Amino acid sequence: MSNIYIQEPPTNGKVLLKTTAGDIDIELWSKEAPKACRNFIQLCLEAYYDNTIFHRVVPGFIVQGGDPTGTGSGGESIYGAPFKDEFHSRLRFNRRGLVAMANAGSHDNGSQFFFTLGRADELNNKHTIFGKVTGDTVYNMLRLSEVDIDDEERPHNPHKIKSCEVLFNPFDDIIPREIKRPKKEKPEEEVKKLKPKGTKNFSLLSFGEEAEEEEEEVNRVSQSMKGKSKSSHDLLKDDPHLSSVPVVESEKGDAAGDLDDGGEGESAEHDEYIDGDEKNLMRERIAKKLKKDTSANVKSTGEGEVEKKSVNRSEELRKEARQLKRELLAAKQKKVENAAKPAEKRSEEEEATPDGAVAEYRREKQKYEALRKQQSKKGTSREDQTLALLNQFKSKLTQAIAETPENDIPETEVEDDEGWMSHVLQFEDKSRKVKDASMQDSDTFEIYDPRNPVNKRRREESKKLMREKKERR
């Protein structure tokens, strides 16, 4: 791979494509393909490729884009016509990450370009290579091909170029053109005029008269309240749950305060003027307060009944809990009484049992339980006790071996607890009865040393014999 990079000529120019798959750095061969590089850089400066999609994806082969129409048949060069191919002997389709011009034939280059996803020797001398993808951005380029495609090699959710940035421009004389892009036409749904509202035919309904009256009332209220904020006070005038007292004090009260400050004569006239209105308002307030008090009393009585029911329920639950506690305590007491029975009664019951095996089992069990209780559970005392048992076993073993001499060991197997201590382990002798007379020992090996003088004399004698035989012949 390093050999390939050495063969390629140095680059002169750099462009950054910002795509939905990530940024892609492209270095350009502006000396080897000047027309293609100038075309590509100027289109990037003119934002020609912005928001264009990669309309063709062939997995393992190429990813093609650069068509503003997104169909694969659009796009034009900066020269106003297709420009010629530019081939170079050191630029080959021998790896991934190369950028080349797409065309429909020879000398038919426009604005479309493609990235190679692998080796493509069949494209040599057919498409102009003008750049390469550099750095880790090659992995973003490979992500462009990770889409689902249809039978015509078109992706279902294509990636697109968000914007282009020219990092190094080798052509100082490029002047971007002002391209007038056609405005996008509005969709047909927005162009369509709104349909006129249909009239309601209430005669078709069984309750048509009532519905028609309600509709007229709603229309009348909506027309009267048009352009104003509406609340429940505006629509529900006869609702007893709504208060007639305004949240914000009326301006009359403020005016009354101002008149009081003005003088006594004016205040007296004002009091006489508003006396009748205030009385009416007070009467209405008192009547409504009485209604609220009665409704509050009804609610309080209902809440009191609910509280009584909840109290009764809680008392019942407490009683049940107390009863359960008593039952648990009684069960515990019975267990303690059963465990505290005298040992004499248990021994009498055991003696009364006719089965001797069961009685023996119980005696053994009691014996080992007593021994277990005597043992300490943990600590240094438990360790000392274990070492004492080990020493006791060792002394018992040595005593059994010393008491039984080798000649007095019986051949029969001993099944008692101490018989195995004096037993001697003996293996069967599998030696051969007939031995080779020439072999001193079966475990010895013959070692031949050529430096041994005996072996030297033997070799000389054998050589003499061989010479004599040859002379006789």
From Swiss-Prot:
CDD domains: CWC27_CTD, cyclophilin_CeCYP16-like. Residues 177-386, 399-473 are annotated as: Disordered. One of its GO terms (cellular component) is U2-type precatalytic spliceosome. It comes from the Eukaryota. Residues 206-230, 305-378 form a coiled coil. Residues 257-266, 405-419 have a biased composition (Acidic residues). Its main location: nucleus. Residues 177-193, 231-241, 267-287, 305-348, 360-372, 426-438, 458-473 have a biased composition (Basic and acidic residues). InterPro entries: Cyclophilin-like_dom_sf (IPR029000), Cyclophilin-type_PPIase_CS (IPR020892), Cyclophilin-type_PPIase_dom (IPR002130), Cyclophilin_A-like (IPR044666). Keywords: Acetylation, Coiled coil, Nucleus, Phosphoprotein. One of its GO terms (molecular function) is peptidyl-prolyl cis-trans isomerase activity. It is found in: Nucleus. Residues 11-166 form the PPIase cyclophilin-type domain. The modification Phosphoserine is found at S347. GO terms for biological process: protein folding. It holds the Pfam family Pro_isomerase. The modification N-acetylserine is found at S2. Belongs to the cyclophilin-type PPIase family. As part of the spliceosome, plays a role in pre-mRNA splicing. Probable inactive PPIase with no peptidyl-prolyl cis-trans isomerase activity. As a component of the minor spliceosome, involved in the splicing of U12-type introns in pre-mRNAs. Part of the activated spliceosome B/catalytic step 1 spliceosome, one of the forms of the spliceosome which has a well-formed active site but still cannot catalyze the branching reaction and is composed at least of 52 proteins, the U2, U5 and U6 snRNAs and the pre-mRNA. Recruited during early steps of activated spliceosome B maturation, it is probably one of the first proteins released from this complex as he matures to the spliceosome C complex. Component of the minor spliceosome, which splices U12-type introns. This is Spliceosome-associated protein CWC27 homolog. It comes from Pongo abelii (Sumatran orangutan). The lineage of its organism: Eukaryota, Metazoa, Chordata, Craniata, Vertebrata.
